[in-house]
A protein has these predicted regions:
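Extended low-complexity, serine/threonine- and proline-enriched intrinsically disordered segments
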Residues: 155-182
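A short, hydrophobic/aromatic-rich structural module that often spans a beta strand
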Residues: 36, 40-43, 128-136, 171
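His/acidic metal-ligating clusters that form di-metal
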Residues: 1-82, 142
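Short small/polar-residue motifs
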Residues: 68-69, 101-105, 191-194
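Aromatic sugar-binding surface patches on proteins
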Residues: 176-210
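Binuclear metal-dependent phosphoesterase catalytic core
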Residues: 78-162, 204-214
Length: 214
């Protein structure tokens, strides 16, 4: 199947925007994210045409589909929240395939400002990170790695060693050992469907501790 905006959809949006004041913020909910499937480097069909119709407004796309969690900033006033799934990996696991716990996102607008947080099922709203010790992460075995699933470019991820500030952690690509364990247990040695295989994600942050760190 193809993902994008059909010509008749663009015509509808163009007509609709004639009635929307320029001061209005826009929230566009759709199933597929603007970037399409995981790993895509180009936008879905006619995405740039849609952008041209809504440009000038503050625009937030809210999407799903991929069972991963990402925040994208396409332009100064055009961003997207691609939200992980409440069902994890189609009810087989407690985590989505990028390592995000199954859950949902809560949006609040107050005094003209939009805020949000990811609510992991079974946890309170402050549960926003999982930490992995050296030896646990497949692509960074010598590092402490933080999975900060709702990270966006406005966030800073920093670390301390034995109470001493060490600076910013390095943003890295990795896969979740928790999801890998869960999906392997669910399939019990059978071939895992391709769309459920562990996905590399860019919301991991790594730091290498010193030899004698406590």
């Amino acid at each position: 199947y193809k993902e994008g905006y059909a010509d008749h959809v663009l015509r509808f949006v163009k007509g609709l925007m004639a009635y929307v004041p320029m001061s209005a913020d826009l929230y566009i909910a759709q199933h597929s994210p603007v970037m399409g499937r995981v790993g895509n480097t180009t936008k879905i069909i006619n995405a740039n045409d849609l952008f041209s119709l809504v440009r000038g407004h503050k625009v937030n796309f809210i999407s799903g589909h991929n069972h991963v969690n990402d925040n994208f900033q396409y332009e100064t006033n055009i961003s997207e929240h691609n939200v992980a799934a409440i069902c994890g990996s189609w009810w087989d696991t407690q985590h989505c395939k990028d390592g995000t716990p199954r859950g949902f996102k809560v949006f609040t607008k107050k005094d003209g400002k939009l805020s949000w947080y990811f609510k992991a099922e079974g946890h309170d709203k402050d549960f926003q990170v999982e930490i992995f010790k050296p030896g646990q992460m497949p692509m960074h075995p010598n590092s402490v790695v933080a999975n900060v699933w709702d990270w966006d470019p406005q966030w800073k991820v920093e670390w301390y060693e034995d109470g001493r500030y060490m600076g910013a952690m390095d943003r890295v690509t990795d896969k979740s050992p928790l999801y890998t364990k869960e999906i392997n247990a669910a399939y019990k040695g059978k071939t895992i469907s391709e769309y459920k295989l562990p996905a590399t994600a860019q919301h991991y942050f790594a730091a290498t501790p010193s030899q004698y760190a406590k």
